[in-house]
């Protein structure tokens, strides 16, 4: 059995602050479950161009608000209780809400190692 808290993760290299967001990597590749679970806080008034070339991601919003935009310009508001899935390694814009952070539980397959970090200075977007 594996039991962890957000507090436990904050003292490790599995707590990642990449500027526009923080991510607690609660379950990672070394745990051997075949997927990873992250608690992610997307900061209000931020925009990140992202793409997961090596992972599929499903996100469930547990608090706040924000939006995700695909590369065709379709914008999807995300609020508590909403889910979005990047099932085709979709490049996307992730935005925190205008007044609120967006809080997500993210599932990655295959799992993250836990120390991946976005690099937002690349105009083509951050990938891993």
Curated annotation (Swiss-Prot):
- Xref: InterPro entries: Ectoine_synth, RmlC-like_jellyroll, RmlC_Cupin_sf
Among the GO molecular function terms of this UniProt record, one is: ectoine synthase activity
Q: In which pathway does it act?
A: Amine and polyamine biosynthesis; ectoine biosynthesis; L-ectoine from L-aspartate 4-semialdehyde: step 3/3
Coiled-coil stretches, from where to where? none
User: One of this protein's GO BP terms?
Assistant: ectoine biosynthetic process
* Top-rank EC class of the record's enzyme: lyase
Reaction catalyzed: (2S)-4-acetamido-2-aminobutanoate = L-ectoine + H2O
Task: State the superkingdom.
Answer: Bacteria
Spell out the disulfide connections.
none
- EC number from the UniProt entry: 4.2.1.108
Task: Tell me which SUPFAM superfamilies the record gives.
Answer: RmlC-like cupins
* A UniProt-annotated Pfam family: Ectoine_synth
Which keywords belong to this entry?
Lyase
Matches recorded under PANTHER family: L-ECTOINE SYNTHASE, PTHR39289
Role played:
Catalyzes the circularization of gamma-N-acetyl-alpha,gamma-diaminobutyric acid (ADABA) to ectoine (1,4,5,6-tetrahydro-2-methyl-4-pyrimidine carboxylic acid), which is an excellent osmoprotectant.
| Protein family membership | Belongs to the ectoine synthase family.
What is the protein name stated in its UniProt record? L-ectoine synthase
- What species is this protein from? Bradyrhizobium diazoefficiens (strain JCM 10833 / BCRC 13528 / IAM 13628 / NBRC 14792 / USDA 110)
Lineage of this protein's species?
Bacteria, Pseudomonadati, Pseudomonadota, Alphaproteobacteria, Hyphomicrobiales
């Amino acid at each position: 059995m594996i039991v962890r808290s957000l507090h436990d993760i904050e003292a490790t290299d599995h707590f990642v602050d990449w500027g526009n967001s923080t991510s607690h990597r609660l379950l990672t590749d070394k745990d051997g479950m075949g997927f990873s679970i992250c608690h992610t806080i997307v900061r209000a008034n931020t925009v990140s161009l992202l793409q997961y070339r090596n992972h599929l991601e499903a996100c469930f919003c547990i608090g706040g608000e924000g939006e995700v935009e695909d590369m065709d310009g379709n914008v999807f508001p995300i609020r508590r209780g909403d889910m979005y899935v990047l099932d085709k390694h979709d490049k996307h814009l992730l935005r925190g809400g205008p007044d609120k952070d967006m809080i997500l539980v993210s599932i990655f397959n295959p799992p993250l190692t836990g120390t991946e970090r976005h690099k937002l200075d690349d105009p083509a977007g951050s990938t891993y």
